[in-house]
Amino acid sequence: MEKTYNPQDIEQPLYEHWEKQGYFKPNGDESQESFCIMIPPPNVTGSLHMGHAFQQTIMDTMIRYQRMQGKNTLWQVGTDHAGIATQMVVERKIAAEEGKTRHDYGREAFIDKIWEWKAESGGTITRQMRRLGNSVDWERERFTMDEGLSNAVKEVFVRLYKEDLIYRGKRLVNWDPKLRTAISDLEVENRESKGSMWHIRYPLADGAKAADGKDYLVVATTRPETLLGDTGVAVNPEDPRYKDLIGKYVILPLVNRRIPIVGDEHAYMEKGTGCVKITPAHDFNDYEVGKRHALPMINILTFDGDIRESAQVFDTKGNESDVYSSEIPAEFQKLERFAARKAVVAAVDALGLLEEIKPHDLTVPYGDRGGVVIEPMLTDQWYVRADVLAKPAVEAVENGDIQFVPKQYENMYFSWMRDIQDWCISRQLWWGHRIPAWYDEAGNVYVGRNEEEVRKENNLGADVALRQDEDVLDTWFSSALWTFSTLGWPENTDALRQFHPSSVMVSGFDIIFFWIARMIMMTMHFIKDENGTPQVPFHTVYMTGLIRDDEGQKMSKSKGNVIDPLDMVDGISLPELLEKRTGNMMQPQLADKIRKRTEKQFPNGIEPHGTDALRFTLAALASTGRDINWDMKRLEGYRNFCNKLWNASRFVLMNTEGQDCGFNGGEMTLSLADRWILAEFNQTIKAYREALDSFRFDIAAGILYEFTWNQFCDWYLELTKPVMNGGTEAELRGTHHTLVTVLEGLLRLAHPIIPFITETIWQRVKVLCGITADTIMLQPFPQYDASQVDEAALADTEWLKQAIVAVRNIRAEMNIAPGKPLELLLRGCSADAERRVNENRGFLQTLARLESITVLPADDKGPVSVTKIIDGAELLIPMAGLINKEDELARLAKEVAKIEGEISRIENKLANEGFVARAPEAVIAKEREKLEGYAEAKAKLIEQQAVIAAL
């Protein structure tokens, strides 16, 4: 084997070999259980980020683990067309390169442009996924707009429409005036901002008076421009100030519209003035109030967010109405919405109706892609009736057919599903699945799989002109069909029979509603088993947290704290990293701050760590459902782990290749150390499998690390040396056999988390075991064997380790050179302790570097010594001639003084109010941690001073 571990040399060639050999495919053995994971499809033109790397590492670990258990495994891969995101990228591209808009191109040509862009950049993410070692079946790769998936989408739309579960209606949506499309709640970013609350007088009609004798109500609003669309004023029915006015009217300022006063819980007595203006066409809460009181809806805005020239008036059901005039005062027509706000306030003030303006903290919705304030807008959209679909989806989780890990996310799911709103599925975009609906000139709507079918079903001749709906479906609509459409539905395929329901879905909790819930609803509606019972899309939902930076901040381009997973694999220089973080930024003014932070954090750029180290770190940080603060130190630690495993394997191979390892017979004697490591490994297998089976990848990674680093490398390899340097033939054969057996098993155990290094080493080790198989990927996963439990070997070895560590600690504390042989005396020995010493003198002398071992008679106190107490004995190391008492005390005093200096430095820092107020929580916690560490170190040194002073 190469002297040093170089992941760059082994990873890519190995992956290409695996893929070419077809190892990632299902084994097709239908007598075995199936195990299937559907990858959450990343955006086709996107690139891999830490969230992908994290979730995909977890999925690949599960898939490799199940594949090694002989199951028929499928990891279904594919990408998402990502409607709005992809369209925006291409719009920006043609604007920058050609100075054109999509309208200059026209719909067909612009869509061709997007397909071109997909062909050009669509391979980036799948290339990057290969670099992670993902063992997905590439031959089955799907795209949400490929022909098969597009047919499935049409099929679902048509069937739901025919079942009256899809309808077209006029409803309020989140409208992005910049992108001119409806967007989902997930694409709305709520920002806290400082605003105002305007208090405006609305004169009472018909000579009515309020309880305080005034002839007006004062209405509080944060959006005075929408006053032009008011159709009511709400007061709380319990409010003594106003309850007698319910059913009376006010005259709307500026417009002179006569609008009713309604009693509604939506008006809080304590908030503002207790009177709320109701604008059903421009506010989600008002829309609901309007429905409860049958108030008309008046839309005053264009799709660009400007004031219309004349308003649109609708009744509660969304039909056009003439109950109110559609006139808008000329001075406000065509004004941009925020200019209109100023103009309305000025006009109200001029009439003497502006009572006061108060500062007010409010939450303002922004479109996360367009970056402008979102407007609730009354538009014609297509909707899915969600309550019918939600009922079985709630029951599936209630009765345990689907389980969430961790369980607390079920509550989040229930709270949303039990209060579900109809789902707006239409988007005013060009890129996506076009809605399969056609209109004739009279505005009648026909839904079908294609125009030909529509004409045939509805007996429409060629003389009837039809135009297809311009809108496309919400991206989440096609994603909701992902688990079954990718397996060939609506055809009844073998794949669907074998792999559906899938086994586990790995997802972030932020998309429980947008994706997880909708997959459950759609799947249970369309997929039934042979008895007609609805099928679930998956049995388990494993929820991951978000990956944040080391200070707990969300990773984002604007913060400049994004780390590309492949930069940790391959390494990146500081100039390249700076270019990546500050090049073509949306907000260039942040570049300087980002540059400084990056230079401080990565003065030399990022070193290459290899894929296995990245995967190990991700697995180790995967504590269920919690957000993860990324830690470069952990990544370095796991790269060191890979080096340690590599070097340990070289040691094993150097000592066993060309030797008789007992795989072809011959007498074998196992030493205590051999018996111990076999028993220890057996226990490790049990604990490790339990961790993987319960989705505790963090615990599994910890078990693997602890066994490999501490038990196998640090202890067992050392404990083999006495046998290697002087054992009998049978003993040598026993130790060689154990070394190879445990290493080979360990490589299989570790393979799901660190596939590249384990395969590379295993190819050498398998020869010694007489294994002829091609790849570790298809080897059986290690199994716990209850008959291999060896309590005696475990107990005896733990005792020896205790004794060796005690001697090593005395050396360190007394500053004795590691190579100097020592005398060891044992006092007050139990029978077990004496037996253990007598049976294992060779081990003890070699590993603790001892010149002699003497068990003292019961009444012998022994010479002046440093002592340590272990189980069933007291260890003594005589100090005569080993240390100079005065020098040693002086050295310790110096150490104590140095540590006291550090302690007072940190204490002063933490006492500085300015530092505590400014520094991030994480930095303060780190300082406190350091302080604790120094305090412990000082206590230990003082203890040592006392021991030496007493000699």
UniProtKB/Swiss-Prot annotation:
GO terms for cellular component: cytosol. This is Valine--tRNA ligase. GO terms for biological process: valyl-tRNA aminoacylation. The gene is valS. SUPFAM superfamilies: Anticodon-binding domain of a subclass of class I aminoacyl-tRNA synthetases, Nucleotidylyl transferase, tRNA-binding arm, ValRS/IleRS/LeuRS editing domain. It is an enzyme of class 6 (ligase). Its main location: cytoplasm. Its EC number is 6.1.1.9. ValRS has two distinct active sites: one for aminoacylation and one for editing. The misactivated threonine is translocated from the active site to the editing site. Catalyzes the attachment of valine to tRNA(Val). As ValRS can inadvertently accommodate and process structurally similar amino acids such as threonine, to avoid such errors, it has a 'posttransfer' editing activity that hydrolyzes mischarged Thr-tRNA(Val) in a tRNA-dependent manner. ATP binds at residue 557. GO terms for molecular function: aminoacyl-tRNA deacylase activity; ATP binding; valine-tRNA ligase activity. Residues 880-944 form a coiled coil.
